[in-house]
């Protein structure tokens, strides 16, 4: 046989002598398959499952520092209560867990601490975790969900002391040489919401209103709460002290002035601050400027 060759552009092809070249549709043999397997495509899973959503976490440490003399400035050392939110995470789409510590107490009076959750509802929420009283509960008589972490932060940080022992905890380098020497009291608030959207909203740090209670309710007088600037008191907090002493946030029906904001001083100062960072903020020591 004769080997036939031909070229197209710069390419060259050769045909074996036993191979015949025919015109279109003139071949005498028909090839049904090339491999013996007919590929009909992948029909896929008829009932595919949605992929699980990844867990969400916030690793910023939020340190809150409070002065307990509101509406007066007091010594304004901002170490009367130090609390940190160390971690927030959402698991199983709907469960928000907040973990933190009450780290230091420089107050000389009985002081409590709580968290008010804004722009969310407690309806249908399952609550678990750990606070001073045991398992956290939503406080009754509140429009917003409120959880009290402790009614006596001195006792929570140092359970061995008496209920009326208000010795400083981790703020005084002189008294026993104790300052910034431990984690204090741990707390955890876990809320399982009806929807993932509600859990994400509750995780927004702007919706987490940490506050202290510097004086308990007495008779018809509601308790004295101290919040960060422009956060309103809870339903159980007094409004009678707004506009008094160094406070200029006149949310008090007996006052004529109409300044806006809560817990703001006449000089624009605050009784509560929040410091976001990658680590716990180093709070001021006692008797130090």
Labelled PLM ranges:
Residues 1-289:
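Extracellular distal adhesion/interaction modules in secreted or cell-surface proteins
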């Amino acid at each position: 046989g004769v080997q036939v060759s031909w070229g197209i552009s710069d390419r060259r092809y050769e045909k074996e002598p036993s191979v015949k070249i025919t015109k279109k549709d003139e071949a005498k043999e028909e090839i049904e398959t090339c491999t013996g397997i007919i590929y009909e495509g992948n029909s896929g899973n008829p009932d595919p499952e949605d992929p699980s959503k990844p867990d969400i976490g916030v690793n910023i440490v939020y340190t809150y520092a409070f002065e307990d003399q509101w509406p007066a400035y007091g010594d304004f050392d901002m170490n009367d209560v130090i609390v940190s939110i160390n971690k927030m995470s959402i698991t199983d789409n709907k469960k928000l867990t907040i973990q933190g510590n009450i780290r230091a107490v420089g107050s000389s009076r009985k002081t409590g601490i709580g968290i008010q959750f804004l722009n969310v509802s407690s309806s249908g929420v399952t609550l678990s975790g750990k606070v001073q009283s045991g398992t956290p509960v939503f406080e009754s008589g509140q429009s917003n969900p409120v959880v009290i972490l402790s009614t006596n932060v001195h006792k929570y940080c140092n359970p061995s002391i008496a209920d009326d022992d208000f010795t400083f905890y981790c703020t005084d380098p002189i008294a026993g040489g104790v300052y910034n020497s431990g984690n204090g009291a741990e707390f955890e608030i876990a809320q399982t919401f009806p929807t993932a959207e509600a859990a994400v909203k509750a995780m927004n740090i702007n919706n987490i209103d940490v506050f202290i209670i510097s004086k308990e309710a007495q008779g018809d007088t509601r308790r004295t709460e101290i919040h960060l600037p422009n956060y309103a008191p809870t339903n159980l907090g007094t409004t009678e002290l707004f506009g008094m002493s160094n406070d200029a946030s006149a949310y008090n029906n007996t006052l004529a002035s109409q300044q806006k904001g809560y817990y703001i001083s006449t000089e624009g100062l605050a009784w509560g601050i929040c410091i976001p960072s990658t680590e716990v903020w180093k709070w001021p020591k006692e008797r130090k400027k």
